[in-house]
Amino acid sequence: CIRDRFGGMALAIITYVAISQLGYVITSRVAAYADAGAPLVYQNAWLMLQVPYGVIGVTLLTAIMPRLSRNAADGDVDAVVRDLTLGSKLTFIALIPIVIFMTGFGVPIARALFQYGAYGAESAEQLGLTISFSAFTLIPYALVLLHLRVFYAREEAWTPTFIIAGITLTKIVLTLLAPLMTSNPDRVVILLGTANGFGFVSGAVIGGFL
């Protein structure tokens, strides 16, 4: 019945959020343990990646979602696969130049936007390197969000929860390894940004198989 279906979806979404927050808490704790300013650097780097996705990725999703949702609701699997393939191709075409730019110019970007007042050159460089080493996250992140919308359109509420579980597990493992991979506390946050990216890579792979 509708009540049972709604209840199951609500439980799946709550579980999704709880798993996601677990990953965030662990990342924040590891970052703070390495360096007091690392959590802010990590958050700023993540926000910088959200800007191009918010402009380009959301636009692509908005353009393709009506057709994709309609085909998913109709149970037309072949059409959904075609739409998903198209969305993936458009994502690559739109975001690859931005990934290249942010990878190559992460430090100048951070210095231009953040280096003022108490935010010194060293902090800006740390942020810039974090942006550079995590810029690749944009593509798997966009693909994961595209996959999630497909599964929600098909009312497969638990599938996104399995995907976020894979993302978070990968992220936690790599996050816990980060302090062991460098003797420089300033570099831990850079590895945490990279760990976040590989988490979404695993999510994109899982979503592709499902």
Residue ranges and their predicted role:
Residues 3-210:
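Membrane-embedded alpha-helical bundles of multi-pass transporters/translocases
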